[in-house]
Amino acid sequence: MQSSKAFTLDEIDQAVKFNEPVYPDHPFYTDFSHVRGDFREKVVYRILNVKTSDGGFSFDADLNSGEKKLFFLGGMKGSGKTSELTKYARNLHRPECYFVVTCNIEEALDMNDVEYMDVLIFQLERLTYELDQAYVPVDKGIIKRMQAWFQQRETEIRAALKGELGFELGVNVESPPLLKTILNIFGQIKVGLQGSKERATTIRSSLKNRFPDFANLFNQYIEEANLSLRQAGKGQEILYIIDGLEKTMSAEMRRKLVIDESNRLRQIKAYTIFTLPIELMKERQKINQFSTVESFPYVKIIERQGNDVEMAFLVFEEFISKRIDLSLFESKELVRKFIRFGGGSPRELLRILEAAAFFADESKGILDETCFQEALKRLANQTAQYLTQEKLDRLKEIHEDNLAGRSSPFDDLVGEMLEDIILMEYNDGSYKRVNPVVELSDLYQQRVLGK
């Protein structure tokens, strides 16, 4: 990703790419942690049993290793979850705290066809790779047991596939019990899961049919790796960060990964953070039965009563100034307008900036009110184009609730509109408002506001 700030109109497009996450060591990174309403970073650390005294981060393995917390961080698209998770990884990955293993499923799995078994195999592969890279040896006994177990699965799978060419784990219980040996096994399974539908289904079925054994091996491997990490002075406990769940193909697939697989999720004993798609926040009570859920909201820039949250505006001004020199804006007030219509979402703000740069007058060489309004009009009507009357009626109710200072109840329509960023959510989810860009659309103006 480009790390150069835009000083000319032509450079803006590359500086505002909104589908590329920014990490804490990147020049564009902005810390929003103190302006996210009721969300507090320290809550995450407490859930993970991390002590944060004297500005450091530590984990007491003797006291907390047996607890193995499963934690879901739920939030809307474009709220900055990936950047936030990367910050946690940076803070916690240290000898006196966690050995953090980040698994971005979008980069490694087939997002059109992914199941929980696929994620688990990916977790094993990533952990083994990171251990190998850190020169951390693991007990040979667990490696031998895994080799033997997967050799049996290979025999079953090849028989079910009638000897189909191309599926070969390379398992040999006589080979040295090295990390690279099982790393190859996990890699080959992952490749097999992304092959034909028949092959993927056969592999998954073989693993699912013996899931208690699989989970037992997984958990033993985690514990042996934890012991090795402590002895090597590389970490006190493994922490998985699983990102990208919201980018899988369908809501049905995402629900299956979390809700339908809850029994298998319970059987895996490792400290883990999952991102939780916004539409599954309605299942919070179910998920809380086997894990902990926290809402990661947009930045609240306007109170329910309509007054600006000045601190949030200042942070977003910093966010913009790191990417675009402020001299490229017609006025400081125009910068505030961009922020206001971003609705507290870093990604939505970048989307508006990109559109405005597209409509900007090259002869002027700046972003002015004219290109800003053209961008808003285009984005507003595109975003609202397929709103049904049922959704418009619900938006009107939410608008009236906010005027009266009331919280709006959740339902499936609200869930759909949160997923599509028609609605935006703040604080702990109790405050919802219409995306300010949508409010400008002809449909909203006519059907909701009656203008």
Predicted ranges, named:
Residues 1-79, 83-94:
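Walker A/P-loop-proximal flanking segment of P-loop NTPase domains
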Residues 2-7, 367-451:
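C-terminal leucine-rich, beta-strand-based interaction scaffolds used for sensing/assembly
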Residues 331-382:
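Amphipathic alpha-helical "lid/sensor" segments that cap RecA-like P-loop NTPase cores
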Residues 101-107, 297-298, 367-374:
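Conserved beta-strand -> loop -> alpha-helix junction used to position metal-binding or nucleic-acid-contacting
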Residues 7-14, 42-47, 202, 206-209, ...:
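The catalytic "switch" region of P-loop NTPases
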Residues 73-80, 245-248, 261-268, 272-273, ...:
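Conserved catalytic-core segments centered on acid/base and nucleophilic motifs
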Residues 69-70, 75-233:
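P-loop NTPase nucleotide-binding core
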